Amino acid sequence: MSASQFGSRFVITTFGESHGTALGVVIDGCPAGVNFDEGLLKKELERRRPGHHGSGQIVSGRQETDAPEVLSGVFDGKTLGTPMAIIVRNQDARSQDYSVIKNSPRAGHADDMWRNKFGHSDHRGGGRSSGRETVSRVMAGSVAQMMMKHVSAPTKVIGYASQIGPMTLTDAERAEVSKKDIDSFQARFPSSRDQEVADLLKKAQDNGESHGGVAEILIQNPPAHLGQPVFHKLKSDLAMAFLSVGATNGFELGLGFEAAEVKGTQFHQGPQDAYGGIRGGISTGESILLRVSFKPTSSILDVAKKGRHDPCIVTRAIPVLEAMTWLVLADHYLWSKTDRI
């Protein structure tokens, strides 16, 4: 099995299964001299865990400590420029909850596809196709964020849920997201209707139901000129990064699919945010707005009631999408340093 690597310059290799001994990442390409912020690493892992800011009633009941162990690549609080390995150990797996899906895969899940493709797979907790795989992405993204803060301090990445099930942010609510503490909302749905969304998800969880939704990522003050002009456009690498996350179903940049309905005189002479901060595959330095849709989670009916599952992945996916964004930014920043002499 291959394809567990991501990146061209800032390269990560992730490993581990949901109910295995540990999950981890090897990072190769992070320059020496970056201040290693262990507090940031722990904070981002905590944000990915179930139960952030009182969200415990609307997410999986699995409680892992996710305490990171840095095995290499850091000394005296700074990166060495050598391969960096970080792991977290699994401590709260309940493999018996998954005995039923060993021979009866969940509808729409990767369970049977992995088994059919490879002939042998780990069904416990979904194995490597589990959402728990994203722990490795968040650890890697934390290091990428450290590097970007070292070279581009003003850059910010803000993720939030813009739609969960039938509930959608208004344009006015969306315009205010950068002023809000997204994590203070149970469902990371920055609206006065956040409790309604939480109630919707709690009801779904109690009834063995699930919901899909949409997450948005806003990149403020990105470095200009990131992205290669043909096969590694910034937008194409961001799309690949997002669509590699489990349960994703669609991707949009800027005006997205709405651009198909707009006349050229409106699109090109209107607000610049229609481009989403990227033109010709290269960042302009303006804010970048990205949107990704998620299908309803596959653990439904009796499987959902017996196990510990999320009724909607969007809430938990926000830190993961932010991490993938930082990875793409770090990768393209290092790449941009070789664009010209």
Swiss-Prot record:
Top-level taxon of origin: Bacteria
EC nos: 4.2.3.5
Family named by the database record: Belongs to the chorismate synthase family.
Binding site residues for NADP(+): 48
Subunit-level organization: Homotetramer.
Catalytic activities: 5-O-(1-carboxyvinyl)-3-phosphoshikimate = chorismate + phosphate
Keywords (A to Z) from UniProt: Amino-acid biosynthesis, Aromatic amino acid biosynthesis, FAD, Flavoprotein, FMN, Lyase, NADP
InterPro entries (alphabetical): Chorismate_synth (IPR000453), Chorismate_synth_AroC_sf (IPR035904), Chorismate_synthase_CS (IPR020541)
NCBIfam families documented for this protein: aroC, PRK05382.1
Gene Ontology molecular function terms on file: chorismate synthase activity; FMN binding
Species the sequence originates in: Bdellovibrio bacteriovorus (strain ATCC 15356 / DSM 50701 / NCIMB 9529 / HD100)
Coiled-coil region list: none
Annotated gene: aroC
Cofactor(s), by name: FMNH2
PROSITE patterns: CHORISMATE_SYNTHASE_1, CHORISMATE_SYNTHASE_2, CHORISMATE_SYNTHASE_3
Name the UniProt record assigns to this protein: Chorismate synthase
Function: This reaction introduces a second double bond into the aromatic ring system.
This protein's GO CC annotations: cytosol
